[in-house]
């Protein structure tokens, strides 16, 4: 997982980042987040060296990334859990 903070928060900067990320196969998922970070991405790489190269490449192509924080998943505790029907009916 990668937490991303953009250097600017204009709509055009967000759209530029999102368009580029959408076309990037290494990024499996990307969510816009409210709070101290702007985006949370799930990234796949065959090795740590490949991951580092990928992230440095993202910083070099002008996507407006100010900072990024790498979070390494060590164990899956719960994954792909559907929303219970009772929760979806409460809308």
Regions found by a protein language model. Give the residues of each.
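A compositional/biophysical signature of low hydrophobicity enriched in polar/charged and small residues
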Residues: 1-91
């Amino acid at each position: 997982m990668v937490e991303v903070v953009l250097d600017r928060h204009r709509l055009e900067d967000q759209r530029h980042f999102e368009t580029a990320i959408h076309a990037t196969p290494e990024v499996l998922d990307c969510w816009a987040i409210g709070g101290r970070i702007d985006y949370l991405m799930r990234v796949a790489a065959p090795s740590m060296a490949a991951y580092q190269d990928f992230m440095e490449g993202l910083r070099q192509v002008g996507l407006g990334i100010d900072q990024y924080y790498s979070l390494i998943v060590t164990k899956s505790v719960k994954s792909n859990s559907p929303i219970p029907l009772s929760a979806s009916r409460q809308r």
